[in-house]
């Protein structure tokens, strides 16, 4: 596919503005990089001031300052010339934040459909196919002469990709890179990101909201609505238009390794209320929200990043549990739905078999050798017309964007080549093909399927039309660029911090306190040992927010154990534990997609905890998987924080110290132990007086 000279998006002066943006020269690039540097330094300083527990080694790369004493006058002269060039060159398209971002409508506007039809009339088949492709990118600064940047530019200019999903990266570099790629695109790029827990999930030095299960533990759907709106505003300030949130899965399987705290809980009606609230807030804030993972990923024991989960239930069961939140989301006007890589043999019994090993694309999500291969599986929802086409599009009447889960996950790559997966997904009813491992193979597969008559050109146009209309209604035709100064005013501001802290404090759940250890009453006189156990590679900083807050009211020592901890480290931790009066077991068993130890804790930590139980008073706190009490039923005091976000860790410390009330309730049951809705309520007055408070009945 050669580069076409024909212009089909905008004519006349608009082309000159884009051309000016593309060819502003090295000095213009120097000016922009200087702005990025200045903004990044100011932003990092502000974040460091607001959160003193942050360590310097976790911040973005060291900044090379653009000016030195030598040659200063020469550089200033060059800078002034560059500024003059920018001032008198034709203006680039206005940025999104320079005009008000409108709420995203529940249905495409008439103007959007007209514009989409005008563009389709001018597009080649290759250009229409390109709109369906949504490539993945870890954003960072890329020199314009680098191979990586050239490859990205080629995807935009030659493959005509319709969008980009952003993964982890620094704030300013991410926005700067998206602006550069937007300037190369004939049709504005649709930029997306997984922002289930706010901007902090994908952008460094920004704020993570508590996981959905923590939001539900508060009992207040308005928190979900406010979180959705703040997330949307921050997303637009970061150049993101489509967010893959909320999770609409009902987590009714305690062994689920990938959904867990990402869900609002196990009750489908409760999940539906919170899902709808988040969608309303997010789309009011000007982004497309995405309900995922249709028709429900909550009752699985396999992570679809590692293999293909099977849910062997019939339609009646789905109607009574899994489909309830998705029906509610559709009624609320959700803009997008993501089918999951989930096998449902009672809905689609089409048998599939694994590819020969040499044909399997190495999944970047899964640990080496950790893939789970089901020898005889059935077609996943992502590629099933019976599930996506007949059920979602037909019976449920969904008319928005259908976005596949990532095409490079083992749930697909173990069974399908990329070109075949792309064709089957479009046959099933998908519009956007998310994060293919081989975009060229997907494009080639779709093109050949049309030429062979397997897919019609009209079917490609259907999806391209939906995508183009969405871009119009997002305001991207008029405003595709994002100004850096909006980041300083909007992202990681006081509103987001306050909301995260408020949700966190209302979420902390005291499930059990048979030992009457909460709150800790002895203050600085009590010797406390914090045994932190993590399933991540973050031992140097994982417990810092908790210990820093706890140290304000108690004397505490901490040791961190992970899967690499030696027997000597375990022994030293136990020695320190025996010298303490109270041991806090901080359990960081978090969702770790694609990892074999997701939601669990490592063996070394498990051995240490079992050795302490029964010897010392132990307060267990789960900063992740709430079901861990089932593995350690001997814990006489157990709190759930539902995640390791700094706001949740600080809230847990304040709750232990008696500085804040405890009002959260379990959104899930702990089978054999506690029912959904359990939560010992400790109000401020009661805590100060030391009154005994009985466990409240489940709501």
Cite the ranges covered by each PLM segment:
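Aromatic (phenylalanine/tyrosine) cluster motif
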Residues: 8, 30, 43, 56-57, ...
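Bacterial N-terminal signal peptides that target proteins for export
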Residues: 53, 57, 63-80
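Preference for extracellular/luminal or secreted protein segments
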Residues: 97-154, 384, 394, 414-699
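Polybasic, lysine-rich low-complexity intrinsically disordered segments
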Residues: 38, 49-50
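Bacterial N-terminal signal peptides
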Residues: 78-90
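Catalytic domains of carbohydrate-active enzymes, especially glycoside hydrolases
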Residues: 150-167, 229-242
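Short glycine-enriched loops at secondary-structure junctions
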Residues: 138-141, 191-201, 241-251, 291-297, ...
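Second-shell residues forming the walls of enzyme active-site clefts
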Residues: 121-124, 164, 173-189, 193, ...
């Amino acid at each position: 596919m050669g580069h076409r000279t024909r212009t089909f998006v905008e004519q006349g002066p608009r082309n000159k503005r884009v051309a000016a943006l593309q060819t502003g020269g090295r000095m213009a690039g120097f000016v922009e990089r200087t702005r990025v540097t200045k903004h990044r330094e100011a932003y990092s300083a502000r974040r460091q001031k607001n959160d003193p527990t942050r360590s310097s080694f976790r911040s973005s790369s060291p900044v090379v300052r653009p000016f030195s004493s030598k040659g200063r006058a020469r550089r200033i002269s060059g800078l002034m010339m560059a500024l003059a060039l920018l001032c008198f060159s034709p203006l680039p398209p206005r940025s999104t934040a320079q005009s008000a971002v409108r709420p995203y409508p529940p249905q495409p506007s008439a103007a959007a459909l007209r514009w989409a039809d005008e563009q389709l009339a001018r597009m080649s088949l290759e250009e229409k196919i390109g709109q369906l492709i949504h490539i993945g990118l870890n954003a960072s600064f890329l020199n314009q002469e680098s191979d990586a940047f050239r490859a990205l530019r080629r995807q935009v200019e030659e493959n005509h990709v319709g969008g980009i999903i952003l993964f982890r990266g620094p704030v300013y570099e991410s926005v700067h890179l998206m602006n550069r790629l937007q300037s190369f695109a004939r049709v504005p790029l649709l930029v997306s990101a997984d922002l289930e827990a706010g901007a902090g999930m994908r952008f460094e030095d920004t704020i993570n909201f508590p996981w959905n299960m923590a939001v539900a533990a508060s009992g207040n759907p308005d928190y979900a609505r406010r979180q959705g709106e703040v997330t949307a505003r921050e997303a637009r300030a970061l150049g993101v238009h489509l967010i893959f949130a909320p999770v609409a899965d009902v987590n009714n399987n305690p062994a689920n390794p990938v959904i867990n705290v990402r869900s609002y809980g196990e009750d489908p009606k409760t999940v539906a209320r919170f899902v709808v609230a988040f969608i309303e807030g997010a789309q009011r804030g000007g982004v497309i929200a995405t309900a995922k993972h249709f028709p429900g990923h909550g009752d699985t024991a396999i992570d679809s990043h590692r293999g293909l989960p099977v849910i062997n239930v019939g339609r009646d069961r789905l109607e009574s549990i899994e489909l309830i939140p998705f029906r509610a989301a559709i009624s609320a006007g959700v803009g997008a739905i993501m089918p999951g890589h989930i096998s449902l043999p009672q809905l689609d019994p089409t048998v599939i078999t694994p590819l020969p090993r040499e044909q399997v694309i190495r999944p970047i999500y899964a640990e080496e050798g950790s893939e789970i291969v089901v020898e005889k599986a059935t077609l996943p929802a992502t590629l099933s017309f019976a599930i996506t086409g007949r059920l979602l599009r037909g019976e449920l009447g969904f008319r928005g964007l259908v976005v596949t889960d990532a095409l490079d996950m083992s749930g697909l790559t173990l069974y399908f080549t990329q070109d075949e997966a792309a064709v089957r997904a479009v046959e099933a009813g998908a519009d956007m093909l998310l994060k293919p491992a081989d975009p060229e193979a997907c494009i080639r597969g779709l093109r050949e399927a049309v030429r062979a008559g397997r897919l019609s050109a009209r079917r490609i146009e259907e999806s391209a039309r939906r995508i183009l209309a969405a871009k119009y209604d997002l305001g991207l035709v008029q405003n595709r660029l994002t100004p850096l100064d909006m980041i300083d005013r909007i992202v990681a501001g006081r509103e987001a911090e306050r909301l995260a802290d408020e949700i966190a404090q209302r979420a902390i759940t005291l499930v059990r306190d048979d030992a009457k250890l909460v709150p800790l009453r002895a203050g600085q006189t009590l010797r406390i040992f914090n045994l932190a156990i993590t399933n991540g590679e973050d031992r140097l900083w994982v417990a810092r927010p908790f210990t820093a807050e706890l140290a304000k009211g108690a004397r505490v020592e901490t040791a961190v154990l992970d899967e690499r901890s030696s027997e000597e480290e375990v022994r030293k931790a136990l020695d320190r534990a025996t010298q303490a009066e109270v041991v806090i077991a901080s359990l960081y068993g978090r969702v770790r997609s694609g990892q074999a130890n997701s939601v669990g804790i490592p063996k070394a930590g498990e051995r240490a905890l079992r050795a302490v139980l029964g010897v010392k008073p132990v307060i267990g706190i789960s900063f992740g998987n709430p079901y861990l009490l089932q593995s350690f039923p001997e814990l006489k005091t157990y709190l759930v924080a539902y995640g390791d976000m700094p706001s949740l860790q600080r809230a847990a410390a304040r709750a232990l110290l008696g500085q804040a009330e405890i009002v959260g309730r379990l959104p899930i049951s702990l089978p054999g132990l506690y029912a959904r809705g359990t939560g010992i309520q400790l109000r401020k007055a009661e805590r100060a007086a030391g009154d005994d408070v009985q466990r409240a009945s489940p709501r």
